[in-house]
Each structure stands twice: as C-alpha cells, then as structure tokens.
Amino acid sequence: MNGFLLVALGGAIGASLRHGVGLVAVRHLPLGWPWGTSFVNIAGSLAMGLLAGWLALKAEGASQEARLFLATGVLGGFTTFSAFSLEVATMLRSGETLKAGLYAGVSVLLGVSALFIGLWMARRIFA
C-alpha cells in the first residue's frame, strides 16, 4: 500500500483520538490548563516508547508499512507538539510567563520520562 495513504489513514485515527481526548478534557476538567494537550503529549510519548521497544525487541521484521501507519500516522496524528508550542506562545503573549514555563517544563519532563517508561515496559513485556 502507498506510504502516504498509510500515514493519512493512521493520522486520521490519531487525530480523531486526539480530538476525542480534547472534548473529554474540556467537558470534564477545570478550565485554565491545556489538559487535553498535556495528556496526549505524555500518553503519545509513552505509546511511542512502547512501540519503539516492541519494534526493536519483537518485531525486527515489521514492515515499513506498519511503522509508517503506527508511528508516523497514528501517533503523529495523536500527539500535538505543534499545538503545545502554540499554547506556550499564547501564554507568553498573554503575560503568563510562569504558567508557560511550568507547562513547557512539566510537559517535556513528563513526556521524556513517559517515553523511557514505555521503553522499560517494552523490555519487560516483550523481551
């Protein structure tokens, strides 16, 4: 199957999931913090760690198509670092410097930590 089509199909799934998370966050969590974006960035990092670990440990022969669909498509559509950047910039432009710094720092720290936890989990599950 064409790589662009696989990425597009996966991206549609990931973006739809991201939209759903955003709707749930807006309806059920306190306003004033980008909960949906925070969640998808951290969960997406965890999922990428698990996927990378699985591909390295158990799916050496995984097709390029599977990698394109899952990593570039689904997870690329799900995670939202471009939205994250916009939200940080918006906070900074609004004079919310402390909030922007806290949001950026916590998101990056937890995202990278979640990726390492995902890799660790993959070694425990798939090795």
Swiss-Prot record:
Disulfides per UniProt: none
Main function: Fluoride-specific ion channel. Important for reducing fluoride concentration in the cell, thus reducing its toxicity.
Main localization (coarse): membrane
Protein localization: Cell inner membrane
Catalytic activity, as annotated: fluoride(in) = fluoride(out)
Organism name: Hyphomonas neptunium (strain ATCC 15444)
Lineage of origin: Bacteria, Pseudomonadati, Pseudomonadota, Alphaproteobacteria, Hyphomonadales
Name of the protein: Fluoride-specific ion channel FluC
Entry GO terms, CC: plasma membrane
